[in-house]
């Protein structure tokens, strides 16, 4: 039995690993740069999950938990209107940790939607409907905020895109993020 609940600060290490998996390791290495490792990037993301003022904050995260209290999946989401303020901690952290300035990064969302930043199910728990459960819980969060729910999907990930369409997301426009072409999908309020 899986339960969906709000994340806890103590879960930051595992949440960070799943955020990195959602981003993909090539993208994480791009952010870390050639002089730093994925472990260095994991340390940064873990510190951001532990904070309350970060886009990756545990406060913005729900987790799928097994009967044995293992984290089977995560979904990180926040009000798109808060992107710039929440992303500033990532920008500051990357500058301090890697000497890289990402202040000119494209905006992946904007005001008017609950934005799903990261969705990932641990590989040992895939194909059990957990991603759909996490999406549905996040869509409900958006309804309570009176916001449609949006996300970006990599154009090279048709399997994820099919899942999003099955849940009711529709293509809004295109975007580029982390060096990848992405589709902006949105699930409207009903």
Model-derived regions: residue spans:
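Conserved GNAT-fold acetyl-CoA-binding loop/helix
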Residues: 26-49, 95
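Conserved GNAT acetyl-CoA-binding A-motif
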Residues: 112-114, 142-154
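Conserved acyl-donor/pantetheine-binding loop and adjacent beta-alpha core of acyl/acetyltransferases
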Residues: 78-114, 118
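Conserved catalytic-core motifs of GNAT/GCN5-like acyltransferases
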Residues: 80-81, 150-152, 165-184
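Conserved acetyl-CoA-binding loop-helix of GNAT-fold acetyltransferases
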Residues: 127-140, 165-166
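Conserved N-terminal entry element of GNAT/NAT acetyltransferase domains
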Residues: 1-10, 27-30, 190
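Conserved beta-strand in the GNAT
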Residues: 63, 70-79, 115, 120
